[in-house]
Amino acid sequence: MNLFDGVYKSPPKDLIETNIKNTRENFTYYYSLFFSNILNDSKTDNFTTYKGNMLGYDNSAISKDNEVYGEYSPELFYKLNKLLIKNIKEYYEESNRFFFINAWNNYFEGTYLEPDERYGYGSLNALSKSLFDLPFRNSNYNLSNLNDKCLVAIHAHIFYKDLLNEIINKTNNIPIKFDLYISTNTKEKMEFIKNHTYIYSKANNISIKIIENKGRDILPFLIQMREVIDKYKYLCHLHSKKSLHDPELGNKWRTYLFNNLLGTTEIISEILSDFENYDKLGFIFPENYYKILKFTMHLDPREKERMNFLFSKIFHGYKFSDKYFDFPAGDMFWARTKAIYQIFKIDLRNDIPQEKGSKFILFAIERFWLFIVKINGYYYKKYFNYY
């Protein structure tokens, strides 16, 4: 057995940490500042010393003297891994190259190396990519087939016109030709949207229609796209989401969805490349926002009733399963049109209530997308782009 002398500096021990909040029972730190501190730890030792990395951490559920490392992301974890690995390769012989991760051992200590609801396998994937010197995101995008003819449609329902510019700016990140379809519910809003969109949008073609705000964004989406969906290969649906009972949550949730669907040209290119490379990939949506996960775990009996109603309208011989299942909470996503086309071919105008009525048909449709995808022989993928 070969032995060697060396010391592993287990983070966050012996590092200068910057508190977000510091009380007698609560110590909260920025993971991003830990990132900087470990890189700037230039102390020279007279023996072999290995810098280590760690993940986000939150043991407040089990300890009064808790520590929380907020603002963690798999991308930051990946970047720090890469820098530490580079340091190891520069200073140590191959036989003495060791890379240590403080993964905190237990789920109940709130670490992220194990798969969890917030990041899925994101941290494990980030670790493997850094170890094997792979790019964090695939950058070999070939979208030339989508530029010859406009095969991408974006639909946005604009109820809150103050969010129009935010939507235009996000859609302008699309690196290929796309057509933009916008629905709204009043003539005044339509004129406002026209005046801004025709000036600032990079869309190939723009279509704006007044459609009754019945069923929030859902009925306008289905009605406006019904006659044109067959022209396109891929479709992205957005809407001017707000939450009147919790404005701060609504804004953060909307921003999270927009960023993960259209946040950068690179993100959009990766999504479209995945569709192009995998013929049976039918639907892509962000991991559900972590602050609303508790509302997505259960199916109300009335929602189940509406799900069965939708099945009877579209499919015959299929029985809805009421097991826990994924769905795009917030109803924003990318889709292959062939994977979801049936729902655009039925008339639901008399089945969707006014906003003051029951919302269970709306929740049912939101939960219905992935069932259509699976029945049509496609699969779905959840994205998390670290916003």
Give residue ranges: language-model regions:
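Short aromatic/hydrophobic-glycine micro-motifs
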Residues: 3-4, 47, 377-378
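Substrate-binding cleft/loops of secretory-pathway carbohydrate-active enzymes
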Residues: 1-13
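Expand to "…catalyze enediolate/carbanion chemistry for C-C bond making/breaking, isomerization
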Residues: 100
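ER/Golgi luminal nucleotide-sugar-dependent glycosyltransferases, focusing on the catalytic module
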Residues: 10-44, 52, 57-74, 78-86, ...
